[in-house]
Amino acid sequence: MTNTKGKRRGTRYMFSRPFRKHGVVPLATYMRIYRKGDIVDIKGMGTVQKGMPHKCYHGKTGRVYNVTQHAVGIIVNKQVKGKILAKRINVRIEHIKHSKSRDSFLKRVKENDQKKKEAKEKGTWVQLKRQPAPPREAHFVRTNGKEPELLEPIPYEFMA
């Protein structure tokens, strides 16, 4: 068969609804509030065809730059051959959700502020940079009365 060039080509599983999640869209989807500067994940919902993003934006993360009654404008990076372009797309709110990618950072900022405040009260210095995991502590290995066995490689023999 020939290769069709439709907008939804190859989206059989991409835009399909999860198991037991078909039918009416939950109202919580419409109750979420989006503001300028919010970071959102784009995920096309097959039950709503209006305002659906193109399949190339499915799974991408962008920043909200415009908010209207039913949709939001999002700036998303898209790779076109060798360059990355900042694309502005309009997507209805059924097809987006707040991204969790920034949550850990914001949590760390709050913790650091708390540490700074406590350190200032005590008049001490505090380490705020994240440190890599240190090497494990030294420990003895139990042999349960057995003698450790020395392993040696077998010498190479050329067989012709």
From Swiss-Prot:
GO terms for biological process: translation. Signal peptide: none annotated. SUPFAM superfamilies: Translation proteins SH3-like domain. GO terms for cellular component: cytosol; endoplasmic reticulum; organelle membrane; ribonucleoprotein complex; ribosome. Keywords: Cytoplasm, Endoplasmic reticulum, Ribonucleoprotein, Ribosomal protein. Residues 112-145 are annotated as: Disordered. Residues 112-123, 136-145 have a biased composition (Basic and acidic residues). GO terms for molecular function: structural constituent of ribosome. Component of the large ribosomal subunit. The ribosome is a large ribonucleoprotein complex responsible for the synthesis of proteins in the cell. Belongs to the eukaryotic ribosomal protein eL21 family. This is Large ribosomal subunit protein eL21. The lineage of its organism: Eukaryota, Metazoa, Chordata, Craniata, Vertebrata.
